[in-house]
Amino acid sequence: MRMLLHLSLLALGAAYVYAIPTEIPASALVKETLALLSTHRTLLIANETLRIPVPVHKNHQLCTEEIFQGIGTLESQTVQGGTVERLFKNLSLIKKYIGGQKKKCGEERRRVNQFLDYLQEFLGVMNTEWIIES
């Protein structure tokens, strides 16, 4: 009986350990990265001759490739070391997160009604969250 109790507690402990997420949540990662960016802004703008393309419009979710190309350019021109490395590591993790989310855009054949529901939701987000230029 005692052995059964010990095994049950051991199994419960193992389940608890494996249930704890090993990765930092994306929202916390973004908050930390924003703080690091604010902290290291002066260091990052030290190279005043460097020019990085900036997307013209403000619908950032459409320009992720351009944003990450700019990050790559900035990283290659920045002296590495200390906490600035943490900034670029976080940006790399954010890029991986976005890449993983994009994979969820894969197509799955569904009924027209389900597609129209998705389209309506998409247009609703576009209407409320995107800056639509005239």
Curated annotation (Swiss-Prot):
GO molecular function: cytokine activity; growth factor activity; interleukin-5 receptor binding
Cellular component GO terms, alphabetical: extracellular space
Protein's GO biological process: immune response; interleukin-5-mediated signaling pathway
Signal peptide: 1-19
Subcellular localization: Secreted
Annotated Gene3D superfamilies: 1.20.1250.10
UniProt main location, coarse: secreted
Keywords in alphabetical order: Cytokine, Disulfide bond, Glycoprotein, Growth factor, Secreted, Signal
Residues annotated as glycosylated: T22, N47, N90
Assembly mode: Homodimer; disulfide-linked. Interacts with IL5RA. Interacts with CSF2RB.
Family designation: Belongs to the IL-5 family.
PANTHER family linked to this entry: INTERLEUKIN-5
Function, as annotated: Homodimeric cytokine expressed predominantly by T-lymphocytes and NK cells that plays an important role in the survival, differentiation, and chemotaxis of eosinophils. Also acts on activated and resting B-cells to induce immunoglobulin production, growth, and differentiation. Mechanistically, exerts its biological effects through a receptor composed of IL5RA subunit and the cytokine receptor common subunit beta/CSF2RB.
Protein name per UniProt: Interleukin-5
Organism: Macaca mulatta (Rhesus macaque)
Organism ancestry: Eukaryota, Metazoa, Chordata, Craniata, Vertebrata
GN (gene name): IL5
